[in-house]
């Protein structure tokens, strides 16, 4: 038996070859969120289990089948690794009275955990960026959040590979009415329902609309539409969202089967999808949740938010041939005792000027060090030998373009590297 440990199924390492592209996604998201006035909030990954039962929904797949939960050995509390970010963010808003002085725009980033079947684009530990806006009643913030995501896709170079799907699921009373309509319809076609749909029939019939079972698609397509059960106020809200998206030139498709997998949503729901990732094509999704804050102990507070699946955005960018690389500006080659002693102070001087430097360590011939300099991806090699040290000079050699190796003072080299 091997003594070597391996990561747990569904929990994986993000290796240095991939982190440059991850950081590009994260940095672009931070920049866009800041442009829209969202502030960062950092939340724990462990929350009370009851938070998700009440917040996400007792009869959702997340709560019924996918959460990592346990009992605290010290006090018997039921705890859960967060399966999504909205409920925890709402808990923090309520606990710290963050909306006392007015509306809040918050964002967070980090790992989430669900015990799901592992496949491409679906892991048991996955990463999300989420944004939540509290205290905004009209359709403006719904449209603005969608616009914010459209801007992010442009920044990342994938705007032409994603499609916005949009729906409205009305308010609680309209959904309750529609729920009964759906139950009656599916009862008439119960022989066509699979086991999962039969389980959902009376607990959460709207989720049947989201089934991917090919044998049920014709029946689902013919099901009554929630739009037919909407009141005037919900229709006006949805019209306001779509009108603003049209004004912004953001294309959208009405998907009347889009309901999202969490019970807290009302009115606007949306997903950004791509056809490049197979069955895991949703890269972001969200909507409005006007009753969640109150249901988790706060005052009645309108809210809207979304989550971005970072693994799927990463995979989409790779599918599109988009890469990012971390390469130093300079690789510092040093050969000889005097050069070796001077190398670290010189590397620090280069870094003080704002340059990134990979300092060769561990000795080696000039030829082997130059080979490593080339492999590092650096634009330049800064070469130190005992002769250069004696003359108080360095050699600067371009690595990515034709150019002569030049001998100069360190200050001249720093100036040249910044031009």
From Swiss-Prot:
One of its GO terms (molecular function) is histidine-tRNA ligase activity. GO terms for cellular component: cytoplasm. CDD domains: HisRS-like_core (cd00773), HisRS_anticodon (cd00859). The keyword Protein biosynthesis applies. InterPro entries: aa-tRNA-synth_II (IPR006195), aa-tRNA-synth_II/BPL/LPL (IPR045864), Anticodon-bd (IPR004154), Anticodon-bd_dom_sf (IPR036621), His-tRNA-ligase (IPR015807), HisRS-like_core (IPR041715), HisRS/HisZ (IPR004516), HisRS_anticodon (IPR033656). It is an enzyme of class 6 (ligase). Keywords: Aminoacyl-tRNA synthetase, ATP-binding, Cytoplasm, Ligase, Nucleotide-binding, Protein biosynthesis. It comes from the Bacteria. Its EC number is 6.1.1.21. Pfam families: HGTP_anticodon, tRNA-synt_His. It is found in: Cytoplasm. The keyword Protease does not apply. It catalyses: tRNA(His) + L-histidine + ATP = L-histidyl-tRNA(His) + AMP + diphosphate + H(+). Its main location: cytoplasm. One of its GO terms (biological process) is histidyl-tRNA aminoacylation. Belongs to the class-II aminoacyl-tRNA synthetase family. HAMAP family: His_tRNA_synth. Homodimer. This is Histidine--tRNA ligase.
